[in-house]
Amino acid sequence: MRMNIKHNLNIVGEHFFDNSGLEFVVTNEAGRSERGDMLYDVQYVKSGYINKNRRRMEIRSGKIKDKYAPIISGVAYIGDIVIPNKKCIERKLYETWKNMIYRCYNPKCYAYKYYGMKGVTVCKEWLCFKNFFYDAKGLAGYNEELIMRKIIELDKDIIDRSLKQYNKETCQWVTVAENRSEGGKTRWNNYRMQQ
């Protein structure tokens, strides 16, 4: 004979931790899923990010994420945007953004000595991928097809080599050849010698 044990189903107000160790609180019930599961909204204590319509199982197991937690090199975060796991412009721009962050803030990155160690930074707005994603589409030279085919890439040196910050005023999309010539020549040759 199976016993029917009632669990406390009201988790509103309870605090939990996600799989990254970040604390969040269940703020309210948000209705039901198509399958009939109770849905809840949760708010992260540190960032204030609200993750909506989460199932109890996701909450209790910690399988939710704070999209405003600085998980990329300890300084950058995704923001409220979805990055598909397939070849698409969102994924390619995410890889471009992540590599830019690594060059400037991760001492373990091969190119850190040419960027972060020399004082190159990323503007505050671009520490959020969502902001970078929308700004990148408005930069001079932007062309989705050429980005996907790896014919053009993001550059901050051609406009003015003395500028030490990635932002929408200093960056543009240029061909790989343009980026490797002149300003990029020394950096590229140094990188190739390390390989």
Language-model-detected regions and their locations in the chain:
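Short, intrinsically disordered low-complexity segments
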Residues: 1, 53-55, 179, 191
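Short helix-coil boundary/hinge micro-motifs
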Residues: 1-53, 68-98
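Positively charged, low-complexity intrinsically disordered regions
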Residues: 3, 57, 61, 193-195
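Short, cationic Gly/His-enriched loop motifs
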Residues: 84-106, 112-194
